[in-house]
């Protein structure tokens, strides 16, 4: 059985890596001043942060139109028998639900939607795993889904924001909490819990927040088992590179990626956000 892998743009897997692993991508949409852009295709992360700075306003975001999902699946149906369609958490987007609905609209391929319950390159790790399983001979979509569900036990992601105002605008914090938090220089560490973004711990400074995320990574990385990990930044590429250099020296058994919060996720976290995600291979 020929099985395809699809993910959406919020996995932030670079184009070259998608092509290398034969991973197909459906973009979410970003609306800037009434202009609609397809994330990662018509708007990359660098252009997004430049636009936000230039106009001092944030875009709105939306899931892919269901017609685009149907069209992608039908096109894949010409070469494949089934598709594993991996998407950002259903708790923050309707993309997974749209993929499930699109399944009933296509006849030439079986669609297996998968809710990653997370986003960014942590979501991308599921797509990479699915592609590896297929390359290594997996021929049952059900078995691949089972492996991905098992993988949820080891996927971790923690991140911090530089400006609480973005969380407040998105309804994550009250205005009073954001104001007081800014005065106290609180840098909340966030994570996904039950499919939504929630505070994990409140830390007083950026430096201490990053140190705490290091500690959380060490709980798994110190076991010495092969792992994937990514340092994810919101327009802080050099800072992410320095962190990777430091962590790679400490954990040579971990494969590190320098990744980013693109337009859709960056809209909700704001420039300066930083996180680390990881999983066992």
UniProtKB/Swiss-Prot annotation:
GO terms for molecular function: lipid binding. Keywords: Lipid-binding. Disruption phenotype: No growth phenotype, no effect on competence. The gene is degV. Monomer. Residues 3-280 form the DegV domain. The keyword Calcium does not apply. Binds long-chain fatty acids, such as palmitate, and may play a role in lipid transport or fatty acid metabolism. This is Protein DegV. The keyword Transcription does not apply. Pfam families: DegV (PF02645). NCBIfam families: DegV. Hexadecanoate binds at residues 61, 93.
């Amino acid at each position: 059985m020929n099985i395809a892998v699809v993910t959406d743009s919020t996995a932030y897997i670079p184009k070259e890596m998608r092509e290398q692993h034969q991973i197909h991508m459906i973009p979410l949409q970003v609306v800037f001043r009434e202009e609609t852009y397809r994330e990662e295709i018509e708007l990359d992360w660098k252009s997004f942060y430049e636009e936000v700075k230039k106009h001092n306003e944030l875009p709105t975001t939306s899931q892919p139109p269901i017609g685009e999902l149907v069209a992608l699946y039908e096109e894949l149906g010409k070469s494949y028998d089934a598709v594993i369609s991996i998407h950002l958490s259903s708790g923050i987007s309707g993309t997974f639900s749209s993929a499930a609905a699109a399944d009933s609209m296509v006849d030439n391929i079986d669609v297996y939607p998968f809710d990653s319950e997370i986003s960014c390159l942590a979501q991308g790790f599921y797509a990479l795993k699915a592609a590896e399983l297929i390359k290594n001979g997996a021929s049952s979509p059900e078995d691949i889904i089972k492996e991905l569900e098992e993988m949820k036990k080891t996927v971790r992601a923690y991140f911090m924001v530089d400006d609480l105002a973005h969380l407040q605008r998105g309804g994550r914090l009250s205005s009073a909490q954001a104001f007081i938090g800014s005065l106290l220089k609180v840098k909340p560490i966030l994570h996904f819990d039950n499919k939504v973004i929630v505070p994990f711990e409140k830390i007083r400074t950026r430096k201490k927040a990053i140190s705490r995320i290091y500690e959380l990574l060490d709980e798994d990385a110190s076991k010495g088992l092969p792992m994937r990990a990514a340092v994810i930044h919101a327009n802080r590429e050099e800072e992410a590179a320095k962190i990777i250099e430091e962590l790679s020296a400490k954990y040579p058994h971990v494969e590190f990626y320098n990744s980013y919060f693109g337009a859709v996720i960056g809209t909700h976290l704001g420039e300066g956000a930083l996180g680390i995600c990881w999983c066992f291979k």
